[in-house]
Structures are given as structure tokens and as C-alpha cells.
Amino acid sequence: MSESIAVIREKLSLVTSEQDPFFQLCTQDERKGVQKLLQSTRKKWEKEAKLAAKLIEMKRYETDLFKQGFQYIAGVDEVGRGPLAGPVVAAAVILPADFSVVGINDSKQLNEAKRDILFDVIKEEAISIGIGIIDHDVIDQVNIYEATKIAMRTALEELNPAPDFVLIDAMPLKYSESELSLIKGDTKSISIAAASIIAKVTRDRMMQQYDELYPGYDFANNMGYGTKKHLNGLDTIGICPIHRLSFSPVKEAKLHFESLK
């Protein structure tokens, strides 16, 4: 074969099977560069096959529910139960039956760049998205578990059309007679995973803005969780207006600074 490596690379990018005549022809080319291209092409196909299989697996609950006649299946998830500061945020997402974007998974398993890309895709393709944001004051009043349920219900109530079936990550919500709570649902249901991405990106962006308002706690990086820098901030600065006073390290910092007055 007399074609350059660059030309072969471009042609292989259009090939989808080892049975393709051009791929077969390349296998006879002994140049190391060509053999490396064949190897990388096979790896690309393997990755694509895994993503396609993962998509089918992630849609199995939705596929079954669509077959049962449900039309508007909402996935619900939350983020921010554990942080010492900021709100708890829930999202509810209704995806179309033909939604086929690969790479949707539990937001915690995706890097920030990937989450941001998928956030935009989900916003563009979803039938409806609802978001519930419950701030630190309510969390302190009712506890984080109840605040999370309020956030989820708020997100669901924002959906239009209203869902006729609800898939929830872990927490039984009793929002509808037609609902299913799934342990680690954000790794099992594409609707819940999509909701986890919407909730995560929404809250992260809020915390990045809070970092500008309340510097010294590293909110832009820890998102309000009790990291070393955050705890150091509590020790040296004290609490800020978005801290959860019912959470132990915050409560201790507040008492400490009050004792110094």
C-alpha cells in the first residue's frame, strides 16, 4: 500500500468494521504506523461498543415502562446532602423515548468538562426539567433528609407535562402511586443519571458563585464539603451566611467564635 499514514488514518476514521475491505487491506501493510492505527481503531470500536451496551443497560427501566404505556417518565436525583454549606439541590428530568446520548452516567463518575457538555445536551433534548433548591435555613429547620425530599418534590412539581411514572435515586418519596426507588439509581437509570448531572452542575455553579461572595473556604473546589481548606476557613474566619448551623463542625465553629466575644 503506497498511501501515507495520514491518508490511511483519515480513511480508517470512516471504517466501522474489520470486515471492511480497506481495513483488511491495511492488515497486510507491515508498516508499524499502520499497525498502530489498526490497533487504535479496534480500541475505539471496543469503547464505542461498551458505551452502546451501557446505554441499552441504562435505559432498561425506561424501555420497560414505555412498553407498559407510560409516556412521561421522570428521573429524580439530588446533590448536596453532605456539605457543611450551601443548598441541597434536586433535579427531575423527563427524557424522550428515543434519547440515545452515550456517556450519561452518575454525575460523580464524570469529570467537570464531561458534565458540562452533557448538561447542555440534556437541557436541549429533555422533554422537561425541574429543579428544586432548598437553602441552608430550611435544612437547619427541618433536617437534611426532609429538606432533600422537599427539593425532590419541588423539582417534580416544576415538570410540564407532569410525569406519569417517577424513578427516584435511593430515597422513597411517596410522590406518586407510580414510582420506583432504585438503590444507586444514578448508575441504573438514564433518567436518574440525567437528573444527577443537572443537579450537580446547577449546585456546583452556585457554589462557585458563593466562593466569590464568601472567600476563604474554597467553596469553588470543595462545593461546601468539609475538606481541610474548608475546615481551616471555619477555624480562622468563622461561619458565613450559607453555612448549615445544624451540622456539627459549623455548630462548633459558631460556638467557638461566640466564646471569644
UniProtKB/Swiss-Prot annotation:
GO cellular-component term (any): ribonuclease H2 complex
Binding site for a divalent metal cation: 77-78, 169
Matches recorded under Gene3D superfamilies: Ribonuclease H-like superfamily/Ribonuclease H
Keyword match Manganese: yes
Protein location: Cytoplasm
Protein family (similarity comment): Belongs to the RNase HII family.
Protein name (Swiss-Prot/TrEMBL): Ribonuclease HII
Species of the source: Listeria innocua serovar 6a (strain ATCC BAA-680 / CLIP 11262)
Higher taxonomy: Bacteria, Bacillati, Bacillota, Bacilli, Bacillales
